[in-house]
């Protein structure tokens, strides 16, 4: 058997098996030593590098995202700094009690009633959907009333064009502000009452610096609301951006604006902040050098080009501003309905005058009206006969 297996002696076989086992053991020891060397090298590399090699991609991403994060943080810091500047120009006082508010609110209702009866001057009352303004002492042109849009174009009305400040405003509001040293004696010569219905608003604006002194004082009544700074308005549909600062305004509270809050940033009332009827009395002082409309001595520079030169002579009182709306007496709910624009009135008038079969023709009703009107000018008989129909040829 020993010869068949290739070994001549059992001792040789045992000797050969022992050498193989020793080789295997030596290989295992060498592998363990090599693994230990690799681990030691990896530990040394980890100690030399702040991040492992496998984290290089993550580190690069973090480095790339740092500028974006810093820009956002910079924007937030700027916004917080601007809000701090706004707050530095705001002073709020809870001055009027519930009973005092009720008395003043009853007086405001009297103002609304007198306006509905047409007892005020033409420029005292300014109506808009969901918001009415009542000017006392001094009034001024703004918004769509201006011939030229933009800051600095506002003008005071001539003296006497708006009613005097009611005596109750002096007794119930102004006098208390003077007693608490909010404003000095004799400071106020302009009082405006803004009456808002739910959903009403006033767009972002700065009270004209060339018209009014600072501070600007307002007192709130009927309900709580908020005064927002730095908003941007968009219309159709109406949308308002996030404010730099939203200032809660409580019923009976006094808000005083000056400095940055009055001059360097816009303020507004958002529609979502008027949930109930709200009124605010704004008390201001006009500047001595504030520009004023002069209706008796108008210059051609303040009139539209269509005005003839002979209209500048005499004692005509043509206003130096384009008409904003009709000043005829309206029913109590008229101010809270959508305005009917002049173009809508014209379209309605056409629909009444045009024949029924012409209202929905294959050509524009506007062209039909224009051609019909031109034909009536050429034919006096057609102009004098309202029932005469003008047949137009289609082209």
Curated annotation (Swiss-Prot):
Transmembrane segments: none annotated. One of its GO terms (cellular component) is nucleus. 2-oxoglutarate binds at residues 194, 196, 205, 267, 278. Its main location: nucleus. The modification Omega-N-methylarginine is found at residue 360. It is an enzyme of class 1 (oxidoreductase). The modification Phosphoserine is found at residues 65, 70, 88, 326, 362, 372, 375, 385. There is a cross-link at residue 58 (Glycyl lysine isopeptide (Lys-Gly) (interchain with G-Cter in ubiquitin)). GO terms for biological process: cell differentiation; gamma-delta T cell proliferation; membraneless organelle assembly; mRNA destabilization; mRNA processing; regulation of mRNA export from nucleus; regulation of mRNA processing; regulation of mRNA stability. It comes from the Eukaryota. The C-terminal disordered region undergoes liquid-liquid phase separation (LLPS) for the formation of paraspeckle membraneless compartment. Belongs to the alkB family. Monomer. Interacts with RBM33; promoting desumoylation by SENP1 and recruitment to N(6)-methyladenosine-containing mRNAs. Interacts (when acetylated by KAT8) with PSPC1; interaction facilitates recognition of N(6)-methyladenosine (m6A) mRNA. This is RNA demethylase ALKBH5. The lineage of its organism: Eukaryota, Metazoa, Chordata, Craniata, Vertebrata.
């Amino acid at each position: 058997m020993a010869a068949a297996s290739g070994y001549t002696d059992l001792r040789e076989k045992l000797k050969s098996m022992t050498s193989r086992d020793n080789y295997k053991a030596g290989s295992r020891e060498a592998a363990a030593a090599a693994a230990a060397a690799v681990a030691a090298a990896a530990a040394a590399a980890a100690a030399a590098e702040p991040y492992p090699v496998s984290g290089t991609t993550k580190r690069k991403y973090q480095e790339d995202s740092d500028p974006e994060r810093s820009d956002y943080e910079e924007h937030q810091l700027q916004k917080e700094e601007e809000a701090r500047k706004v707050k530095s120009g705001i002073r709020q006082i809870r001055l009027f009690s519930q009973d005092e508010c009720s008395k003043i609110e009853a007086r405001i209702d009297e103002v609304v009633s007198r306006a509905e009866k047409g007892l005020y001057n033409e420029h005292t009352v300014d109506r808009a959907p969901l918001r009415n303004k009542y000017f006392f002492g001094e009034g001024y042109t703004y918004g769509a009333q201006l011939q030229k849009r933009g800051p600095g174009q506002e003008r005071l009305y001539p003296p006497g064009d708006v009613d005097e400040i009611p005596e109750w405003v002096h007794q119930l509001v102004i006098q208390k502000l003077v007693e608490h040293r909010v404003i000095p004696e004799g400071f106020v010569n302009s009082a405006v009452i803004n009456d808002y219905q739910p959903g009403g608003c006033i767009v972002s604006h700065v009270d004209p610096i060339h018209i009014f002194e600072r501070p600007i004082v307002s007192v709130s009544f009927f309900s709580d609301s908020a005064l927002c700074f730095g908003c941007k308005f968009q219309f159709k549909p109406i949308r308002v951006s996030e404010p730099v600062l939203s200032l809660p305004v409580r019923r009976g509270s006094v808000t005083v604006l000056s400095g940055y809050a009055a001059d360097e940033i816009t303020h507004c009332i958002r529609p979502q902040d008027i949930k109930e009827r709200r009124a605010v009395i704004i008390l201001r002082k006009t500047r001595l050098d504030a520009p004023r409309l002069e209706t008796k001595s108008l210059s051609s520079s303040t009139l539209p080009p269509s005005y003839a030169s002979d209209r500048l002579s005499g004692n005509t009182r043509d206003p130096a501003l384009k008409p904003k709306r009709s000043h005829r007496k309206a029913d109590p709910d008229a101010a809270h309905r959508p305005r009917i624009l002049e173009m809508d009135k014209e379209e309605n008038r056409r629909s009444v005058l045009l024949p029924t079969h012409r209202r929905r023709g294959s050509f524009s009703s506007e062209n039909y009206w224009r051609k019909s009107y031109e034909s009536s000018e050429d034919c006096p008989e057609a102009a004098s006969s309202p029932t005469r129909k003008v047949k137009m040829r289609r082209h």
